[in-house]
């Protein structure tokens, strides 16, 4: 059987689905799952089918209230991944020039390539606080550039891009007729800083996000794209080719979440606050890791000073039943990503075991 060259696989997603699971999983980037029994819903109140054509009206209204954006700018989609697909497909034609941050979430690259984009990269360097360099981005822009792709909070570092910098990036893009896509799936984990979507900053900014990562609500598959009204209209029509209509039961559960949101938000914030302190204590104790103090987000991206990350990951899995995400999936093989959204006891023991593996590879030089 011959496959088209447009058939693209995701190396990271395959690893995450087949290799990440472990007793002490520090690879997962989201908050631990919220339980169905804790939602104020009854089975007999749910329906299997409903009038969900271009948005179920009660859910569209709830999303608009939740996001502080007009309904006509919001497209409900199946998670952030499909939202990213729709946003890119709305903007890009095959052969269009796309600038994507490095390091980044691998599916952003794969999706742009699948859609036929000519992907080029700009750097977010640790010495610059993982922020985009506006001067570098300006040099990289071409008259044919159609899209700049960012994550905020940054995946994998959790760095937050200030609004002023996002406005400057949008202005640069607008000078060549380009748009900016900001993946905000982790932004709500900047609780104390008052997370607000970049969609409010400029008409050429498209935003994607979901309830998955920060709130432990992956099973709802509630994602969204925010764009200008014309981009939203095109995304709804494009989604007729992919999603057609969503699962109505999931829509009803999502509405229950959004109308009873405070305890869900508070649970996530409490967990991440406690776990962040554990992570910072661990990082402070390790001279073999280079990482700034963690202030927000669900992940950190330390650099290993000695040895190899692959040896560390292999030792951690083989001897300690634990996992972190190798930096090779972010094109930075000297780094690895730690997730802190797991139960506090799991994080504490996982970090303890990570420390043991760091000690072991430091002594052996990376040998098994």
Where are these regions (language model features)?
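PLP-dependent aminotransferase-like
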Residues: 7, 90-150
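Active-site phosphate-binding strand-loop segment of PLP-dependent enzymes
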Residues: 126-191
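N-terminal small-domain helix-loop-helix segment of the aminotransferase-like
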Residues: 2-86, 259, 361, 368
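Conserved glycine-rich beta-strand-loop-beta hairpin in the small C-terminal domain of fold type I
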Residues: 255, 271-280, 290-303
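PLP-dependent enzyme catalytic core of the Aspartate aminotransferase-like
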Residues: 315-324, 330-368
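Conserved core segment of the aminotransferase class I/II
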Residues: 203-273, 280-281, 352, 363
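Helix C-cap/helix->beta junction micro-motif
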Residues: 115, 175-176, 286, 320, ...
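A short helix->loop->beta-strand "cap" motif at the edges of active sites that frequently abuts
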Residues: 96, 117, 175-178, 203
């Amino acid at each position: 059987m011959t496959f088209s060259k447009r058939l693209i696989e995701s190396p990271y997603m395959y690893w995450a689905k087949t290799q990440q699971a472990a007793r002490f999983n520090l690879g997962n980037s989201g908050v631990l799952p919220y339980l169905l029994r804790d939602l104020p819903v009854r089975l007999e109140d749910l329906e299997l089918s409903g009038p969900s054509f271009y948005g179920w009206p009660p859910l569209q209204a709830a999303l608009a209230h939740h996001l502080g954006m007009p309904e006509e700018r919001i497209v409900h989609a199946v998670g952030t991944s499909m939202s990213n697909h729709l946003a890119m497909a709305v903007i890009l034609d095959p052969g269009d020039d796309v600038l994507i941050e490095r390091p980044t979430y691998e599916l952003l690259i794969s999706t742009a390539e699948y859609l036929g984009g000519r992907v080029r990269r700009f750097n977010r360097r640790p010495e610059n606080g993982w922020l985009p360099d506006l001067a570098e981005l300006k040099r990289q822009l071409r008259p044919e550039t159609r899209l700049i792709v960012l994550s905020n909070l940054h995946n994998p570092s959790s760095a937050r891009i200030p609004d002023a910098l996002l406005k400057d990036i949008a202005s640069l893009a607008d000078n060549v007729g380009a748009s900016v896509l900001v993946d905000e799936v982790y932004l709500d984990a900047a609780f104390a800083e008052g997370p607000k979507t970049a969609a409010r900053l400029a008409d050429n900014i498209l935003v994607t996000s979901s309830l998955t990562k920060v709130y432990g609500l992956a099973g709802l598959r509630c994602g969204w794209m925010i764009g200008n009204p014309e981009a939203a209209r095109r995304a709804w029509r494009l989604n007729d080719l992919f999603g057609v209509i969503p699962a109505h039961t999931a829509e009803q559960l999502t509405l229950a979440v959004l109308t009873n949101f405070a305890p869900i938000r508070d649970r996530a914030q409490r967990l991440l606050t406690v776990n962040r302190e554990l992570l910072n204590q661990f990082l402070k104790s390790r001279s073999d890791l280079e990482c700034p103090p963690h202030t927000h987000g669900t992940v950190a991206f330390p650099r290993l000073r000695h040895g190899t990350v692959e040896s560390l990951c292999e030792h951690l899995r083989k001897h300690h039943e634990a996992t972190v995400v190798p930096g090779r999936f972010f094109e930075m093989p000297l780094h690895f990503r730690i997730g802190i959204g797991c139960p506090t006891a799991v994080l504490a023991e996982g970090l303890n075991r990570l420390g043991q593996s760091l000690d072991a590879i430091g002594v052996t030089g990376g040998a098994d």
